[in-house]
């Protein structure tokens, strides 16, 4: 029998893992970059992908001096590019089967 481990991080742990301030986390949540469960920052719980997203968001905000809206858009577009690359790779493999016949 297999079990799935679900990791949830509180605000303090997310701040430590992503090396960002609580103020940054609030901004990131307000702009929909990460979506915690819970109603208030004290109750927020984040999944295990949140530190990576939060770190990327903070880096874009600081290094490129993007507004948070721009950060959210940039991350969304980067995710879309990655999905399209994966889909393109899969389709190339499928096409390769037909061209080798």
UniProtKB/Swiss-Prot annotation:
Domain of life the protein comes from: Bacteria
Which parts form a coiled-coil structure per UniProt?
none
| InterPro entries documented for this protein | CbpM
The record's Gene3D superfamilies line, in alphabetical order, gives: 1.10.1660.10
Identify its protein family: Belongs to the CbpM family.
Protein function: Interacts with CbpA and inhibits both the DnaJ-like co-chaperone activity and the DNA binding activity of CbpA. Together with CbpA, modulates the activity of the DnaK chaperone system. Does not inhibit the co-chaperone activity of DnaJ.
Q: What is this protein called?
A: Chaperone modulatory protein CbpM
Q: Which organism is it from?
A: Pseudomonas putida (strain W619)
């Amino acid at each position: 029998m297999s079990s799935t481990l679900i990791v949830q991080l509180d605000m303090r742990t997310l701040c430590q893992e992503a090396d960002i301030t609580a103020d940054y986390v609030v901004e990131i949540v307000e702009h929909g970059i990460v979506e915690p469960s819970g109603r208030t920052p004290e109750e927020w719980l984040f999944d295990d992908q949140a530190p990576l997203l939060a770190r990327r968001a903070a880096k874009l905000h600081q290094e490129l001096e993007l507004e948070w809206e721009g950060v959210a858009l940039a991350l969304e577009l980067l995710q879309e590019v990655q999905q399209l690359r994966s889909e393109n790779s899969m389709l190339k493999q499928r096409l390769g089967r037909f061209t080798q016949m």
